[in-house]
Amino acid sequence: MKILLLGGNGQVGRELRRSLVPLGDVVVATRDGVEADVAANFDEPAALAAMVRDVGADVVVNAAAYTAVDKAESDADAAFRTNAEAVAAIAAACTDTGALLVHYSTD
């Protein structure tokens, strides 16, 4: 099974990296591409959806989020793009490819 993990360098993502390895081939995507197999551009939802389609995973696990709460108030557009528009694009790409989507969030 091929698993695409978005947000693999975050608090939840790092734990998921360890937990998902026994389940299949894990492809890690991060915003900056550091310690990742692919870069995930959350500022461009269409590009993000294309990346999801290109990877062709059976399961997409989204642990990525805009988590800078104070900054989100002053940069609401970026927070909305990452936490809403990007997630919608990921969901649409999963629908197109038949991939199962698992979305994680913390508060």
Protein language model regions, located:
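SDR active-site strand-loop-helix element
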Residues: 6, 29, 62-64, 101-106
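Rossmann-fold cofactor-recognition segment
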Residues: 30-46
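Structural signature of beta-strand start/N-cap positions in the alpha/beta core
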Residues: 2, 25, 56-58, 100
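N-terminal Rossmann NAD(P)H-binding glycine-rich loop of SDR-like oxidoreductase domains
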Residues: 1-23
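A generic structural signal for well-ordered alpha-helical segments
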Residues: 20-21, 52, 94
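NAD(P)H-binding glycine-rich loop region in Rossmannoid oxidoreductase-like domains
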Residues: 42-82
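Conserved glycine-rich Rossmann-like NAD(P)H-binding loop of the short-chain dehydrogenase/reductase
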Residues: 11, 25-33
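NAD(P)-cofactor binding segment of oxidoreductase domains
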Residues: 60, 74-102
